[in-house]
């Protein structure tokens, strides 16, 4: 995360809501001295007050075989980002920068059992289909008998038990109001511009 505390977000509810709103995450881990990176959509679980993003990977993914013994990982959710031109500032002698929002969760990873994996897939579909309303939601009931179970064999589920949760919302908070608002104006209708104005 960014070292400047002005960009730091520590409100747990805000951070979890951000991940839920940006559920396609990057999973980074080091296992046996080798770095691994994978991507997956997640569903956030509240397990008796313990927060855990559930995810799934193809059985062909290089990280998947390590799920059975577990490992430590970081899950990174990213949101809007934008290049900021110094031409947009009122102040002189500035340099370009990048504004962005991201949240990282660190913890230990364990495999999901078959029932947990099925629940994850059902919940993930429901979560994402809800974003498509008023479209009638897709469910696996629409699939031919046995097809879902057959496809299930091609993936493995995992759960990251969150021990550290941090966010960086870098929106030019370190700039004078005139510079920050000038940059927001320069971005026009870019989604991050509205965040910079508030």
Question: What annotation goes with each model-predicted range?
Answer:
Residues 2-26:
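Short, basic/aromatic recognition patches
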Residues 16, 93-94, 147-150:
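A generic local secondary-structure boundary/capping motif
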Residues 59-123:
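Short, structured beta-strand-loop surface elements
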């Amino acid at each position: 995360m960014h070292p400047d505390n002005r960009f730091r977000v520590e409100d747990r509810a805000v951070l979890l809501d951000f991940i839920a709103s940006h559920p396609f995450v990057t999973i980074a881990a080091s296992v046996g001295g080798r770095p691994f990176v994978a991507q997956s959509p997640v569903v956030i679980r509240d397990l008796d007050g313990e927060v855990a993003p559930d995810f799934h990977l193809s059985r062909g993914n290089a990280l998947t075989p390590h799920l059975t013994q577990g490992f430590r990982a970081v899950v990174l959710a990213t949101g809007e980002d934008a290049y900021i031109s110094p031409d947009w500032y009122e102040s002189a002698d500035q340099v370009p920068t990048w504004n962005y929002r991201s949240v990282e969760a660190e913890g230990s990873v364990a495999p999901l059992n078959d029932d947990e994996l099925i629940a994850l897939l059902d919940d993930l579909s429901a979560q994402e289909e809800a974003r498509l309303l008023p479209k009638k939601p897709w469910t696996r009931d629409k699939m031919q008998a046995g097809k879902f179970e057959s496809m299930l064999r091609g993936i493995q589920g995992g759960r990251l038990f969150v021990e550290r949760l941090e966010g960086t919302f870098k929106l030019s908070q370190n700039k004078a109001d005139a510079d920050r608002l000038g940059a927001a104006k320069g971005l026009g209708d870019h989604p991050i511009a509205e965040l910079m104005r508030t």
